[in-house]
């Protein structure tokens, strides 16, 4: 097995994104914040924006359902950059070290409306040979079609690719398509995991 291409997810692997970074300054208690994020402005709701739904439509839908939280819902996208704390520096350093030795690609579930902010504000994105953004394609992981789109667009062979993601469902989908994979958890040392692939 020869790895030629390394494919990175962004959130949870290279970037520290969490809605709590915004809402911990909005709600008085963690209990209120967690209720809002677990039951109202949920990750499932946000995933539809990653799939291509507009921020305006998503906000209006939720405000109509929960008018008592109208102000807090509006903040989700108007103050979105606050959720992006910054890079996961040790992994970004690994990415920089891989540049020039491997073909590097990004495969991310990210809204087409907010991804440009990150792309313009973090220089490491320029290291990638190509990036597939779910919101631009109207497809999200773990749908196998977005993995196939990546392979087709950049003429890649899955068995020569190493896919790195923090979501196990996304990892399972990639494995089913013959990608090599690394699942990044809270205790994962990415450098050690790469060494298992002689990288």
Where are the predicted features?
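A structural alpha-helix within SAM-dependent methyltransferase catalytic domains
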Residues: 96-99, 151
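N-terminal helical cap/lid subdomain that shapes the substrate entry/recognition surface
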Residues: 2-89, 93, 100, 111-114
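Asp-based, Mg2+/Mn2+-dependent phosphohydrolase catalytic module
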Residues: 1-4, 111-112, 119-199
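Generic structural signal for small/hydrophobic residues in well-ordered secondary structure
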Residues: 9-12, 52, 98, 106, ...
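A generic structural motif
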Residues: 101-103, 179
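Alpha-helical structural context
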Residues: 25-26, 65, 101, 121, ...
């Amino acid at each position: 097995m020869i790895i030629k291409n390394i494919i990175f997810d962004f959130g949870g692997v290279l970037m520290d994104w969490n809605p709590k970074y915004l809402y911990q300054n909005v709600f008085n208690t963690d209990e209120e914040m967690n209720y809002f994020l677990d039951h109202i402005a949920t990750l499932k709701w946000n995933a539809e924006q990653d799939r291509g739904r507009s921020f305006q439509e998503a906000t209006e839908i939720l405000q109509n359902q929960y008018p008592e939280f109208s102000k807090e819902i509006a903040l989700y996208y108007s103050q979105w950059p606050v959720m992006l704390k910054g890079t996961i520096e040790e992994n970004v350093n690994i990415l920089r070290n891989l540049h020039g030795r491997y073909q590097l690609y990004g495969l991310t579930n990210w809204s087409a409306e907010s991804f440009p902010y990150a792309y313009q504000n973090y220089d490491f994105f320029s290291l990638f040979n190509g990036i597939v953004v779910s919101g631009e394609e109207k497809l999200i992981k773990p749908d196998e079609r977005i993995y196939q789109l990546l392979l087709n667009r950049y003429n890649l062979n899955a068995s020569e690719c190493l896919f790195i993601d923090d979501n196990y469902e996304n990892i399972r989908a990639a494995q089913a398509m013959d990608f090599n994979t690394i699942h990044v958890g809270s205790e994962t040392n990415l450098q050690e995991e790469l060494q298992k692939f002689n990288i």
